């Protein structure tokens, strides 16, 4: 009945309840009007009193069962069930007293029905401890009204028994007057009572069994707990007591006609605080301090935004030209300084190498002269490509194989140490042109080399051959087999190299150490040529694998140098023609240059005075270097020109090998009409990388001066005392051509 309020009126559903109420009230009324007066006189006045009390009890329970809320659960709101409606499973199991009970999802009310709850199809509500929907009371029988329904059945049964019994007593005393009104009304009441007595008594007996067993009509009909244990039973007495004497369950829905505003203060709501200062304890690396912070929302949000939007500062942008100026005036002292010169970088950059912050590359001053070999020989580029791919990146592309050698002088943090190049070029001329000459058997060769110190480059930390330009390979560069040791003479190490990522002095450590263990070194051209032995280009290419480069680790200067190489290609070709033309006009082959007079070591050994095998002409000997001594000048004109075979050249390919095998080296005068490809090509840079520090610079006494001090005593790789030596060839210094390279570096080329 209560659920009919606010809904559409349906008269059909009130027919059963109206019939039941009419029969109940009408039969009892007729009984009291026509039968009870005689029973009061004949039997006892208690009879009408008893029937009246029972009738009131029946009527009260009937009213309670009809109009009372059975225990309807409120439906879920739209915003409450929108997340669970489609994703929720149909059933969910819960454990009650160790027994699994299944709960079903209600698609109408949008929640899982509690145990013993069911959705009434007539009322369209989920009812707690749903028993059944009774049409005679027009209400669902649930937890809250089952007691009254059960008492109604009991009292109605008792009332019907009393009305039928007292009516039968009245009829038996009035058999001779059956046609009388009082007897006829009593017979009608007895018929109605008897007619409904059988179903009411049957229903009452059924519910008495359910109450005794602690079940509901729904559980009994659907067969729940039929083969198992009912977790909700309390025993017979406990079940009856629970039904008849338990407190009334609360109501879950409010009466729509009564909307009572209730002010609820949940305990989890905190009172509003004023804008007072709150002491906040901040832990900063073990130091605790109290900071007064404003509790305002704007200040807190500002702190959050600041912490979120704050990004680590970017590393300083490298200025190529400013770094060149600073590198010209700096020395190894800044590299060996105890104070770090690198700026503080954030965590995301501190594991990446910083390029250009430490002066590891020294460029030429304008007063120094650079003599370059400009013959367009692809072999020079081949050796340039094999330039220590472990200490700095190999950036030569295959289509640049024909580019001249001076591309290595581009302005880049990874470029060569040009001072060391000029100071050791004369020693390379002696060694490279004599690589295939047979060394003297009993002579012990001594090489003045700058090998990385054991503490700096340990074998365990060296990277592999195919290592990329990573941070580990930059700090611990390894030495390739072809670089650290001569292939023709495995026991003789070649000149060391200077890694651009470590100071020069770190590589000078073992120079005095080698001088202590070795005797006086011999400076015979034969020994130097054997010390710098050569390999065939095929074996060198097979031995060397291309080194992958991680371009994301390269600096901006290196990436710019790659783009600028194409621009210099045309300029190099023009320079190549001019230099080659002047070189062909030269007439003297300087082949046996010795070391300067000021070299600190002792005189040459006797081995240097033995007969010198035939040597090959080199274009490096044609450019920029006067003969050192009159002895060497006189011996240069008496040398025998021997043919160079293809096995002594590192730079010949398939067709070039056959041509050079048949070609004899002649004077540049006789070769002036030959094509540029047939000109003998200098292997001065064939085996040693141009970045190697010269033997002259590394063979000094343990007292190491700065690079600037050494550079002031040398011009074009010679000492100042020898710079004024008259040239053996008048046409050697006919003109000087200035070339400006990348980064403002000026090169003077003697042609």
From Swiss-Prot:
Q: Which gene encodes it?
A: zdhhc8b
Return the annotated region ranges for Disordered. 293-346, 437-461, 633-659, 666-685, 703-736
Q: What is this protein called?
A: Palmitoyltransferase ZDHHC8B
- Recorded GO CC terms: Golgi apparatus; Golgi membrane; mitochondrial membrane
Keyword set, alphabetical order: Acyltransferase, Golgi apparatus, Lipoprotein, Membrane, Mitochondrion, Palmitate, Transferase, Transmembrane, Transmembrane helix
Q: Which ranges make up the Cytoplasmic topological domains here?
A: 1-13, 63-148, 207-751
Enumerate the GO terms in the molecular function aspect.
Answer: palmitoyltransferase activity; protein-cysteine S-palmitoyltransferase activity
User: Which residue stretches does the UniProt record annotate as biased composition, category Low complexity?
Assistant: 326-338
Stated role: Palmitoyltransferase that catalyzes the addition of palmitate onto various protein substrates and therefore function in several unrelated biological processes.
**Listed transmembrane segments:** 14-34, 42-62, 149-169, 186-206
Q: Which reaction does it catalyse?
A: L-cysteinyl-[protein] + hexadecanoyl-CoA = S-hexadecanoyl-L-cysteinyl-[protein] + CoA
Residues forming the DHHC domain are 104-154
């Amino acid at each position: 009945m209560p659920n009919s309020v606010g809904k559409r009126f349906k008269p059909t559903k009130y027919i059963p309840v109206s019939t039941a109420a009419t029969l109940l009230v009408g039969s009892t009324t007729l009984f009291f009007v026509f039968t009870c007066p005689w029973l009061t006189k004949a039997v006892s006045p208690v009879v009408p009193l008893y029937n009246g009390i029972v009738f009131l009890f029946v009527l009260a329970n009937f009213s309670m069962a009809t109009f009372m809320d059975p225990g309807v659960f409120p439906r879920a709101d739209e915003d409450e069930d929108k997340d669970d409606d489609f994703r929720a499973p149909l059933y969910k199991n819960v454990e009650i007293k160790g027994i699994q009970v299944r709960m079903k999802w209600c698609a109408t009310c949008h929640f899982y029905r509690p145990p013993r709850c069911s959705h009434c199809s007539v009322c369209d509500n989920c009812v707690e401890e749903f028993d059944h929907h009774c049409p005679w009371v027009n209400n669902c029988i649930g937890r809250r009204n089952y007691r009254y329904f059960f008492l109604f059945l009991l009292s109605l049964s008792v009332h019907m028994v009393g009305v039928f019994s007292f009516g039968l007593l009245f009829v038996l005393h009035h058999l001779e007057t059956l046609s009388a009104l009082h007897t006829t009304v009593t017979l009608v009441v007895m018929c109605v009572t008897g007619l409904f007595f059988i179903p009411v008594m049957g229903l009452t007996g059924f519910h008495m069994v359910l109450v005794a067993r602690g079940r509901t009509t729904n559980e009994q009909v659907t067969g729940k707990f039929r083969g198992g244990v009912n977790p909700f039973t309390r025993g017979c007495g406990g079940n009856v007591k629970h039904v008849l004497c338990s407190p009334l369950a609360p109501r879950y829905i409010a009466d729509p006609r009564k909307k009572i505003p209730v002010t609820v203060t949940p305990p989890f709501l905190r009172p509003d605080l004023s804008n007072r200062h709150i002491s906040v304890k901040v832990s900063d690396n073990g130091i605790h301090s109290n900071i007064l912070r404003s509790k305002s929302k704007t200040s807190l949000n500002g702190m959050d935004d600041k912490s979120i939007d704050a990004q680590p500062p970017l590393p300083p942008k490298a200025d190529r030209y400013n770094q060149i100026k600073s590198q010209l005036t700096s020395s190894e002292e800044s590299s060996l300084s105890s104070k770090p010169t690198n700026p503080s970088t954030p965590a995301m950059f501190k594991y990446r190498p910083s390029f250009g912050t430490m002066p590891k590359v020294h460029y030429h001053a304008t007063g120094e002269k650079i003599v370059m070999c400009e013959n367009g020989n692809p072999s020079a580029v081949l050796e340039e490509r094999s330039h220590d791919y472990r200490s700095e990146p190999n950036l030569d592309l295959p289509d640049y194989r024909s580019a001249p050698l001076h591309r290595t002088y581009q302005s880049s943090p990874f470029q060569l140490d040009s001072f060391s190049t000029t100071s050791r070029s004369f020693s390379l001329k002696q060694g490279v042109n004599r690589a295939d000459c047979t060394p003297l058997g009993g002579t012990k060769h001594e090489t003045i080399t700058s090998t990385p110190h054991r503490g700096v480059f340990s074998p365990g930390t060296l990277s592999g051959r195919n290592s990329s330009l990573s941070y580990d390979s930059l700090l611990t560069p390894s030495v390739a087999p072809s670089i650290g040791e001569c292939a023709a003479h495995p026991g003789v190490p070649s000149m060391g190299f200077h890694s651009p990522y470590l100071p020069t002095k770190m590589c000078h450590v073992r120079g005095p150490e080698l001088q202590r263990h070795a005797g006086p070194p011999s400076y015979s051209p034969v020994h130097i040529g054997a010390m710098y032995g050569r390999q065939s280009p095929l074996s060198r290419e097979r031995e060397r694998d291309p080194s992958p480069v991680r371009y994301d680790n390269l600096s901006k200067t290196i990436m710019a140098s790659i783009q600028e190489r194409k621009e210099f290609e045309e300029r190099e070709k023009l320079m190549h023609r001019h230099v080659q033309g002047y070189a062909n006009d030269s007439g003297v082959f300087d082949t046996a240059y010795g070391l300067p007079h000021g070299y600190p070591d002792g005189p040459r050994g006797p081995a240097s005075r033995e007969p010198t095998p035939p040597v090959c002409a080199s274009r490096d000997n044609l450019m920029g270097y006067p003969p050192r001594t009159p002895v060497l000048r006189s011996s240069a004109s008496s040398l025998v020109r021997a043919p160079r075979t293809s096995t002594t050249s590192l730079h010949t390919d398939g067709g070039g090998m056959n041509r050079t095998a048949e070609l004899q080296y002649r004077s540049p005068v006789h070769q002036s009409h030959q094509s540029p490809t047939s000109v003998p090509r200098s292997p001065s840079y064939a085996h040693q990388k141009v970045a190697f520090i010269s033997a002259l610079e590394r063979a000094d006494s343990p007292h190491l001066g700065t690079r600037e001090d050494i550079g002031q005593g040398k011009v074009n790789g010679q000492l100042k005392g020898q710079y004024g030596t008259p040239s053996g060839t008048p046409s050697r210094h006919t003109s000087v051509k200035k070339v400006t390279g990348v980064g403002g570096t000026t090169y003077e080329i003697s042609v």
